[in-house]
Amino acid sequence: EKEKELDVQNTTQALQDTLGPFVFKALQGYMLKYVPQKDEKIKGFIKTFTPIRFNRYSTGTMMREHYDHIHSLFDGQRKGIPILSILGVLNEDYEGGEFVFFGRHEVPLKAGDIMVFPSNFMYPHEVKEVTKGERYTFVAWAF
C-alpha cells in the first residue's frame, strides 16, 4: 500500500512577515542557550531562514525517518546549507503523529511549541502516522 503523502503549503509574504519574528525569537533563544556566545566566530552565525512551510498530516499520513541537511532546497533565491531546523506545532486535536528522534525518543509537543534542532545526519527524525484528525505544523530552516 502506498504511503499517504502530507499536504505541504508554502507561506505568503504577508504570513511570513507575521510569523517571521516569532521564528527568529525562537532561534535567538536557542542560540543564547546552546551556543557559546564568547566565541567571536559564532556571533552572526545564523544569517537568515527559509520561507515558512506549512505541513498538514491527515489521518493515515506520516513522514518516514530522515534528516534535514537538504542541499536542493537551498539552491534558489536564498543560497546556503541548513544549519538548524525549526518546527512549530499549531494544534493538538489529533491522535498519533508523534515526533520521534533516533527511532525511539518521542518529543512531547503541544500547540504553540517551537522546537529548534541541528539540520544534520546526527539528528534523524520522523513523524509517526496520524491515526485520527489532522496534525498541523510549520517548518523552516536557518542558515
What are the language-model segments listed below?
Residues 1-114, 122-143:
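Fe(II)/2-oxoglutarate oxygenase catalytic core
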